[in-house]
């Protein structure tokens, strides 16, 4: 069973590193009022040498990220959407509950309107589907947490002064 997590981990990597920016860019070109505010992205934040210098040795920043990743990604989003809502949605949506759950997950990210299509697509195919298919919330937790692990290594590099 757990070998099935590998294709979904590869899928989230390809999705996040190659396809999300294209899909989100297309979305924003159709609806420019949903564009990301200037200077809002993590990339813009980390491009400032002044900020990078301040974060060297700032272990509190790394700890804050880890706590946020645990409570938001794992305990918040995954156990709420896949552990609580998905099984209950099957009563209404039947075998298409995973699609409805992924769409709901995407619109949960309404505070980042430029990324709604990306959140819907990843929510449906990379988080909700494996959880539904294998009847294990851990499938969604592991795949979704891969994103957090990636960012944890980036932030660790900043704190260690490697960036």
Enumerate the language-model features and the residues they cover.
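Membrane-interface helix/loop boundary segments of multi-pass membrane proteins
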Residues: 29, 76-100, 129-136
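Functionally important transmembrane alpha-helices
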Residues: 99-108, 114-163
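Short, motif-level signal for alpha-helix interfacial/capping segments enriched in acidic residues
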Residues: 51-59, 87, 113-127
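Juxtamembrane helix-loop-helix connectors linking adjacent transmembrane helices
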Residues: 1-72, 161-163
């Amino acid at each position: 069973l757990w070998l099935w997590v590998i294709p979904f981990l590869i899928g989230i990597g390809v999705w996040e590193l190659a396809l999300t920016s294209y899909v989100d860019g297309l979305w924003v070109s159709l609806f420019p009022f949903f564009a990301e505010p200037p200077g809002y992205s993590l990339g813009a934040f980390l491009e400032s040498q002044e900020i990078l210098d301040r974060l060297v040795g700032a272990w509190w920043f790394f700890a804050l990220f880890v706590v946020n990743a645990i409570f938001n990604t794992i305990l918040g989003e995954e156990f709420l959407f896949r552990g609580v809502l998905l099984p209950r949605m099957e009563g209404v949506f039947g075998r298409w509950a995973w699609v409805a759950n992924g769409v709901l997950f995407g619109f949960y990210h309404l505070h980042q309107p430029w990324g709604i299509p990306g959140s819907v697509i990843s929510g449906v195919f990379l988080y909700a589907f494996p959880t539904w298919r294998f009847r294990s919330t851990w499938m969604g937790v592991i795949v979704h947490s891969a994103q957090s692990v990636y960012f944890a290594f980036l932030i660790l590099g900043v704190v260690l002064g490697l960036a």
